[in-house]
């Protein structure tokens, strides 16, 4: 629901009805994999346009249920792309420590705020919220933009070290891709 609603909102930024239709066609898709092998196959196929990966900890790998499959999946994806957002979901809080150690975001499936926490991570790390330019040293907010027009109006006001920080980590490309603005994002 949330991703589809955001895609509809982004389409309204288009200049004309044709551009809005193109944006809706290019909107982000949620892909579901039931095994490690399916997940890696989907990642390999779509990695150039992947906004992020959300994984459970336990699921089948090599034909058997594997209690480490989620960590193995995210570790293997991280080897290919050090900046793609990776979110681990688990009902076992002990997995949070390992997720933190591996630099994966973590969501506790037992949390009463699960949907809010997941939505926040998707907004902040997968390009669906405002784009927040940060100081690369302090991580303090420098500027915030909600639309492509605001980005255009503010881009030359952003300090070069902040711009380089975000560009080198594909943050801006991810934000543009979430809005189906592919030619600019590349």
Regions flagged by a language model, labelled:
Residues 89-186:
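Long, compositionally biased intrinsically disordered regulatory segments in eukaryotic proteins
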Residues 5, 20, 64-68, 72, ...:
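Alpha4 helix (beta4-alpha4-beta5 surface) of REC/receiver domains from two-component response regulators
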Residues 1-3:
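Short, solvent-exposed beta-strand-terminating loops
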């Amino acid at each position: 629901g949330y991703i589809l609603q955001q895609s509809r909102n982004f389409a309204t930024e288009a200049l004309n009805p044709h551009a809005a239709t193109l944006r809706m066609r290019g909107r982000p898709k949620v892909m579901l994999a039931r095994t490690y092998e399916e997940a890696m196959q989907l990642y390999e196929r779509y990695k150039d346009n992947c906004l992020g990966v959300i994984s459970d900890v336990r699921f089948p790998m090599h034909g058997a249920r594997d209690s480490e499959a989620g960590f193995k999946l995210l570790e293997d994806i991280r080897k290919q792309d050090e900046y793609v957002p990776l979110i681990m979901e688990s009902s076992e809080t002990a997995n949070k420590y390992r997720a933190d150690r591996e630099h994966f975001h973590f969501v506790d499936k037992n949390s009463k705020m699960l949907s809010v926490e997941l939505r926040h991570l998707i907004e902040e790390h997968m390009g669906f919220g405002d784009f927040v330019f940060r100081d690369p040293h302090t991580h303090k907010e420098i500027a915030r933009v909600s639309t492509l027009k605001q980005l255009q109006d503010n881009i030359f006001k952003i300090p070069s070290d902040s711009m380089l920080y975000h560009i080198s980590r594909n943050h801006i490309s991810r934000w543009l891709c979430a809005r189906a603005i592919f030619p600019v994002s590349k």
